[in-house]
């Protein structure tokens, strides 16, 4: 597995034509985040020994990795991160990075149950952000397998990981998705590797 980090506020090398086409019409901030994410993605492909290639955006907005690679890209306002692995070693990967700032308490009920928030052992707004990040990483890992869009209530935070509340293709009801999470003073990073 390989990872790379880029700053979305800094200029990055030019994109491939299909990557450039994907950001036509986007605002400058989103274009910079996309370019930084793809730059990080290109770096992880190089680290894995893959030939240089584009990472186009699919209709579902997910990155399209080479057929022998699984990967994920995420960004916050301060950092873009990409992680990837050869598909012979890892089934799927999901990553999420968020600035560690409290969400409005009103949003917490849309993201997590009171029991899930309690698992985070943090004030409600920070707990909601951390649950959001975990669910986002798990969503990104399961999506290439299930091809099923999920709402926040489809996955439940447990001490062992996130549990499916109902079956989706490739996962039975109760299937666990392992998620690791790290926080520091500025960022929350969640990673799900299947």
Regions flagged by a language model, labelled:
Residues 1-194:
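Core catalytic alpha/beta fold that binds nucleotide/phospho-ligands
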């Amino acid at each position: 597995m390989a990872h790379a980090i880029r700053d979305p506020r800094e200029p990055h090398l030019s994109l491939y034509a299909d990557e450039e086409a994907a950001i036509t019409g986007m605002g400058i901030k989103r274009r910079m985040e996309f370019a930084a994410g793809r730059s990080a993605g290109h770096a992880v492909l190089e680290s894995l020994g893959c030939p240089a290639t584009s990472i186009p955006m699919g209709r579902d907005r997910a990155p399209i990795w080479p057929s022998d690679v699984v990967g994920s890209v995420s960004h916050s306002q301060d950092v873009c991160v990409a992680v990837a692995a050869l598909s012979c070693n890892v089934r799927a990967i999901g990553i999420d990075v968020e600035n560690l700032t409290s969400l409005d308490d009103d949003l917490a009920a849309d993201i997590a149950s009171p029991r899930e928030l309690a698992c985070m052992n943090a004030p409600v707004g920070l707990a909601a952000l951390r649950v959001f990040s975990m669910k986002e990483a798990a969503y990104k890992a399961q999506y290439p397998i299930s091809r099923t869009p999920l709402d926040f209530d489809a996955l439940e935070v447990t001490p062992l990981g996130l549990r499916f509340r109902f079956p989706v293709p490739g996962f039975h009801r109760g299937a666990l998705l392992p998620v690791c999470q790290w926080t520091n003073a500025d960022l929350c990073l969640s990673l799900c590797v299947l």
